[in-house]
A protein has these predicted regions:
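Conserved glycine-rich Rossmann-like NAD(P)H-binding loop of the short-chain dehydrogenase/reductase
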Residues: 28-42
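Amphipathic alpha-helical dimer-interface segment in Rossmann-like NAD(P)H-dependent oxidoreductases
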Residues: 76, 110-128
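Rossmann-fold cofactor-recognition segment
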Residues: 47-65
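Conserved NAD(P)H cofactor-binding loop of Rossmann-fold oxidoreductase domains
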Residues: 85-93
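Conserved glycine-rich cofactor-binding loop
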Residues: 12-13
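C-terminal helical subdomain
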Residues: 172-230
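Catalytic loop of short-chain dehydrogenase/reductase
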Residues: 107, 133-158, 164, 171, ...
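Catalytic Tyr-X3-Lys loop
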Residues: 90, 97-116, 159
Length: 230
């Protein structure tokens, strides 16, 4: 039987890389998708050097067709997909009254829409398995707008709502969908370090094997630890 597969969309040097390493350490094969080819290759080769079976594809996550194809190829090659983590967002240093509708839509295309695209790409395989975990990186700006970066909170609020909609719709198929609201700045040596976030994701994936009635759909990562809120 093949190893479980974790697909990381938005596999940057912080949370994405830490999440890939964590699932790799748990015996998962890892598939990486991100726009920066050089960083992606560096992460992929480092995982391979650590003994993790790893594949990667550079891709602009706003390109629905390319992102879908990349994920479908990973699923087809592995014959399964167990965990999907969707991590992208865009920080735009603009106040709300300086932001155009085009700016807002462009940022939603990075920070929200890839969750839907990626989820739809893994659904045929997860439904056939009758199990799977879909996880999305949220942020406290979803309900507490970040000063001077109006679109960030809109991305995260929409992401949470979309995650909850997917959770409701997919639970009957055995698919656990959850979002982690990071209520602080992601930085090493803090309660919001990338490795801490990665462990929360690993714990949520493990929870998928339990009774769906007890699945967490929204959890807050606070300075005091993990708080289930829905």
């Amino acid at each position: 039987m093949s190893n479980p597969l974790a697909v990381i969309v938005g596999a940057g040097p912080g949370i994405g890389a830490a999440t890939a390493r964590r699932f790799g350490s748990l015996g998962y094969d890892v598939a990486l998708v991100a726009r920066d080819e050089a960083r992606l290759t560096e992460l992929g080769t480092s995982l391979q050097a650590a003994g993790v079976t790893t594949g990667w594809t550079p891709c602009d996550v706003t390109d629905e067709a390319r992102l879908t194809l990349a994920i479908e190829r990973f699923c087809g090659h592995s014959g399964r997909v167990d965990v999907l983590v969707v991590n992208p967002s865009r920080y735009r240093a603009q106040r709300s009254d300086e932001t155009s509708a085009a700016d807002l839509l462009a940022d939603l295309a990075v920070g929200t829409a890839p969750l839907l695209t990626a989820a739809r790409a893994v659904l045929p395989t997860m439904r056939a398995q009758r199990t799977g975990t879909i996880l999305a990186t949220g942020g406290g700006s979803a309900d507490r707008p970040f000063p001077g970066a109006a679109t960030l909170g809109v991305q995260k609020a929409a992401l949470r709502n979309l995650s909850l909609a997917l959770a409701e719709d997919l639970a009957p198929d055995g698919i656990h969908v959850a979002t982690v609201t990071i209520r602080g700045t992601v930085a090493e040596g803090t309660p919001f370090a990338p490795d801490v976030v990665a462990q929360v994701y690993a714990d949520l994936a493990e929870q998928t094997a339990s009774d769906p009635a007890g699945w967490y759909r929204v959890v807050d990562l606070t300075a005091d630890g993990v708080v289930p809120v829905g």
